[in-house]
């Protein structure tokens, strides 16, 4: 069991900042506490960036602290403007209800039997006059506008609706502290201003000191957010990002980002990580395979991780060096294969498909009218056991 969680988070490059760091360190060592992590259900799945916070919540839970997970079923109706240039898409309430239901299942999958709240339970009880009178007096608009949470939107035209987001999230912390003795909020580093707003509200209304802790965002070595794919994000739901595509994302990760990803997302010993990340040339493939397997296992379980690993090796190992062909999306598959002389005739192509003798990335082609779909990764078209064609799709 960990004895010094803050030190561990720093060693694993998870720690960004905390208010009253020394006091928080003692607070977590001296007794078991209630803490909370929040997620707005703006999609029907969590993504890999969210998993960083789940990972930290699990570490604290294993130390004996009690997690309270807050799903923003009310705040999702407004949308967090933090770091955004454009106004968020306004979601229908029925969509948020559906998203909340699926995310609850994911939370339980990763954290087990934990306390899950929906903030509409308390936020819907507030009336507007009460918000302005009882909460608004504790917020300086000048200070709010100076934070990173609003600066990007300010240039484009910040709405009153968005301005209220910080107040409502601060009230979440206030409510949980008052009713559940929650003394710590954990969020991504982009949530620092919102977390401090909640801590300050509690201090001014209740004269109590609470803590905020932020985690580093999961980014590549070049600063780009990790997890961007052709589907928009690296989703934890296999129906949105297949287990194979999830596995392959880590296989294709740039070499410079490997060590940080190992540290942030796995519990592998640091010495082992150093050894793996010091491998050079073709041997670095072993490092990527280890990373891909460990993270896929965390999210999807050992069985599916092994299946993805085996499929990846089957598709990509021992292949001859082939030219990568650029293909426009929406191209008819049979027409393309005949044009490139990969298959002699359309009749042969139809026969291969009917006999399940043609695959794309190890998936049988079953539709005689199949078109070539856009994929971020390379696609390996296999005819029989030994004939391959490697393609990369480009938008028409």
From Swiss-Prot:
InterPro entries attached to this UniProt entry: aa-tRNA-synth_I_CS, aa-tRNA-synth_Ic, Rossmann-like_a/b/a_fold, S4_RNA-bd, S4_RNA-bd_sf, SYY-like_C, Tyr-tRNA-ligase, Tyr-tRNA-ligase_bac-type
Family: Belongs to the class-I aminoacyl-tRNA synthetase family. TyrS type 1 subfamily.
Gene3D superfamilies, per database record: HUPs (3.40.50.620), RNA-binding S4 domain (3.10.290.10), Tyrosyl-Transfer RNA Synthetase (1.10.240.10)
GO function terms (MF aspect): ATP binding; RNA binding; tyrosine-tRNA ligase activity
Entries under NCBIfam families matching the protein: tyrS
CDD domains: S4, TyrRS_core
HAMAP family to which the protein is assigned, alphabetical: Tyr_tRNA_synth_type1
Residues annotated for L-tyrosine binding in this entry: 36, 165, 169
Organism in which the protein naturally occurs: Mycoplasma genitalium (strain ATCC 33530 / DSM 19775 / NCTC 10195 / G37)
Keyword check for Aminoacyl-tRNA synthetase: yes
Gene Ontology terms: biological process: tRNA aminoacylation; tyrosyl-tRNA aminoacylation
Motif ('HIGH' region): 41-50
Top enzyme class: ligase
Protein name as catalogued: Tyrosine--tRNA ligase
Motif interval(s): 'KMSKS' region: 225-229
Signal peptide location: none
Changes seen on gene knockout: Probably essential, it was not disrupted in a global transposon mutagenesis study.
């Amino acid at each position: 069991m960990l004895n010094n969680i803050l030190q561990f988070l720093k060693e694993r490059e998870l720690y960004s900042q905390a208010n009253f760091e020394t006091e928080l360190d003692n607070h977590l060592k001296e007794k078991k506490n209630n803490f909370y992590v929040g997620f707005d259900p703006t999609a029907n799945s969590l993504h890999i960036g969210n998993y960083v916070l789940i990972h930290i919540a699990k570490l604290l839970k294993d130390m004996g602290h009690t997690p309270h997970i807050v799903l923003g079923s009310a705040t999702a109706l407004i949308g967090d403007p933090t770091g955004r240039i454009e106004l968020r898409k306004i979601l229908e309430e029925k969509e948020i209800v559906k998203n909340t239901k699926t995310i609850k299942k994911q939370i339980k999958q990763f954290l087990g039997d934990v306390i899950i709240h929906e903030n509409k339970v308390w936020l819907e009880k507030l009336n507007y006059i009460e918000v302005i009178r009882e909460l608004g007096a504790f917020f300086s608009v000048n200070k709010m506008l100076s934070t990173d949470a609003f600066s990007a939107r300010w240039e484009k035209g910040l709405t009153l609706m968005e301005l209220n987001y910080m107040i409502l999230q601060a009230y979440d912390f206030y409510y949980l502290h008052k009713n559940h003795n929650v003394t710590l909020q954990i969020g991504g580093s982009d949530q620092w201003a919102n977390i401090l707003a909640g801590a300050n509200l509690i201090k001014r209304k209740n004269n109590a000191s609470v803590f905020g802790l932020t985690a580093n965002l999961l980014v590549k070595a070049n600063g780009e957010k990790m997890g961007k794919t052709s589907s928009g994000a690296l989703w934890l739901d296999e129906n949105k990002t297949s287990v194979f595509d999830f596995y392959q994302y880590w296989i294709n990760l740039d070499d410079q980002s490997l060590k940080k990803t190992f540290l942030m997302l796995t519990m592998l010993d640091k010495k082992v990580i150093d050894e793996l990340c010091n491998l050079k040339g073709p041997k670095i493939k072993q490092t990527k395979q280890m990373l891909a397997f460990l993270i896929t296992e965390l999210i999807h379980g050992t069985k599916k991780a092994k299946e993805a690993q085996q499929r990846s090796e089957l598709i990509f190992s021992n292949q001859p060096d082939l030219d990568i062909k650029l293909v426009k999306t929406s191209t008819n598959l049979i027409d393309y294969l005949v044009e490139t002389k990969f298959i002699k005739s359309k009749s042969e192509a139809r026969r291969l498909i009917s006999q399940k003798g043609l695959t794309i990335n190890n998936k049988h082609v079953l539709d005689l009218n199949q078109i070539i779909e856009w994929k971020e990764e390379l696609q390996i078209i296999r005819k029989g056991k030994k004939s391959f064609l490697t393609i990369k799709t480009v938008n028409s």
